[in-house]
């Protein structure tokens, strides 16, 4: 009886590993289903797959464990993340139900299916437990290789054909033929003139020499800031910095000091008038 | 611990994946749930391989992985081309087969 039990159970270490990592795997799977954003789902699924790789290693499937990490978490999940980035990370699933009560029915179906599967396993007579030790005696990779290239050689060849077909299929599906001719630079310029858009290059940002940062609007001759000088992206993000009066006053103080040191008396009239007018405008 | 527990875990993961396919409407997440189901099957295969003491289960799991890789490549290409034509990855919007 005890011998049978010993053959039937695994070591305590593996049991602890199973219960700890199994919980993580189930939580990861649940998060995959219930996270609203696709990126979070993908990351949770990657975690579950790594846990499964550890289980493969614990079950003596060393080759599959490594392949799981390299192919699944390394290649497939990264491909998923690439597509999520293409489609848009911020696009969260809408929570509006299109079919009434579909979510609860789906949960009910899932529950029923799970109960069916688990009671099925519980009733099956799984008396046989041989352990993988003997099969792995000559090495796991060698054992798999000798089986693949003898008994499963046709399946292996067909898998190769499948992979080639999939690669060609993906290229055909994502390749897009250009239907119209790309417009030349001359045509684009003529169109711009016809539409009456702003033709010359846009004015540079920055206020005098102290603020040539791109997020500060340049001043027009009358001292008012011009929105046109700041890049469109910054304008749409609302990241334009104000030309504060304090900075202007600083600048004026600096110039006055410079003038005193240089012992200049007359101030250039254009500068002076620009300051005064900007002050008036701000008031 | 009885190694049959691995089968229970596989059944649980498969069920979660199947429920996800029914609940979610984002095509990418549905696809991820399918991957989860495939992985659960692989775990069951590996556990069976250990129970029976031969490597056939592991080889089937290996073939499953190759087929899953091919499936992901084609499936994601379909999702990308759907997104290009409809600007949405929701399975509700793709009610017609034509693009």
From Swiss-Prot, chain B:
One of its GO terms (molecular function) is NADH:ubiquinone reductase (non-electrogenic) activity. Pfam families: Oxidored_q2 (PF00420). Its main location: membrane. It is a multi-pass membrane protein. Its EC number is 7.1.1.-. It comes from the Bacteria. InterPro entries: NADH_UbQ_OxRdtase_chain4L/K, NUOK/Mnh_C1-like. The chain crosses the membrane at residues 3-23, 28-48, 59-79. It catalyses: a quinone + NADH + 5 H(+)(in) = a quinol + NAD(+) + 4 H(+)(out). One of its GO terms (cellular component) is plasma membrane. GO terms for biological process: ATP synthesis coupled electron transport. It is found in: Cell membrane. Keywords: Cell membrane, Membrane, NAD, Quinone, Translocase, Transmembrane, Transmembrane helix, Transport. The keyword Disulfide bond does not apply. Belongs to the complex I subunit 4L family. NDH-1 shuttles electrons from NADH, via FMN and iron-sulfur (Fe-S) centers, to quinones in the respiratory chain. The immediate electron acceptor for the enzyme in this species is believed to be a menaquinone. Couples the redox reaction to proton translocation (for every two electrons transferred, four hydrogen ions are translocated across the cytoplasmic membrane), and thus conserves the redox energy in a proton gradient. NDH-1 is composed of 14 different subunits. Subunits NuoA, H, J, K, L, M, N constitute the membrane sector of the complex. This is NADH-quinone oxidoreductase subunit K 2. It comes from Streptomyces coelicolor (strain ATCC BAA-471 / A3(2) / M145). The gene is nuoK2.
């Amino acid at each position: 009886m005890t011998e049978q039990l010993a053959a039937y159970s695994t070591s305590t270490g593996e049991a602890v590993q199973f219960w700890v990592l199994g919980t993580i795997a189930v939580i990861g799977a649940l998060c995959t289903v219930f996270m609203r954003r696709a990126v979070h789902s993908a990351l949770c699924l990657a975690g579950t797959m790594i846990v499964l790789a550890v289980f493969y290693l614990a079950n003596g499937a060393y080759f599959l464990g490594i392949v799981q990490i390299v192919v699944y978490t390394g290649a497939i999940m990264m491909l998923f993340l690439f597509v999520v980035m293409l489609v848009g990370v911020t696009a969260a699933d809408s929570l509006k139900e299109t079919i009434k009560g579909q979510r609860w029915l789906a949960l009910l179906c899932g529950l029923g299916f799970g109960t069916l599967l688990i009671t099925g396993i519980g009733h099956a007579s799984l008396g046989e437990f041989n352990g993988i030790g003997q099969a792995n005696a000559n090495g796991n990779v060698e054992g798999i290789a000798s089986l693949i290239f003898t008994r499963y050689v046709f399946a292996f060849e067909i898998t190769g054909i499948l992979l080639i077909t999939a690669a060609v299929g993906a290229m055909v599906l994502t390749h897009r033929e250009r239907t119209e001719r790309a417009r030349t630079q001359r045509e684009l310029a003529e169109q711009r003139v016809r539409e009456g858009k702003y033709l010359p290059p846009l004015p540079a940002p920055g206020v005098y020499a102290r603020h040539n940062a791109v997020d500060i609007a340049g001043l027009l001759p009358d001292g008012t800031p011009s929105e046109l000088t700041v890049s469109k992206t910054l304008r749409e993000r609302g990241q334009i910095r104000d030309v504060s009066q304090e900075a202007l006053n600083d600048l004026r103080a600096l110039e006055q000091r410079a003038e005193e040191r240089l012992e200049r008396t007359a101030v250039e009239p254009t500068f002076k008038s620009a300051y005064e007018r900007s002050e008036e405008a701000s008031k | 611990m009885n190694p049959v527990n691995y089968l229970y875990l596989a059944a649980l993961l498969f069920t979660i994946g199947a429920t996800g396919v029914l609940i979610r409407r984002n095509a990418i997440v549905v696809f991820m749930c399918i991957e989860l189901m495939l992985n659960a099957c692989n775990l069951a295969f590996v556990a069976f391989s250990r129970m029976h003491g031969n490597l056939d289960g592991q080889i089937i799991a290996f073939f499953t992985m190759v087929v899953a890789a091919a499936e992901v490549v084609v499936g994601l290409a379909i999702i990308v081309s759907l997104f290009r034509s409809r600007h949405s990855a929701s399975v509700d919007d793709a009610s017609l087969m034509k693009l």
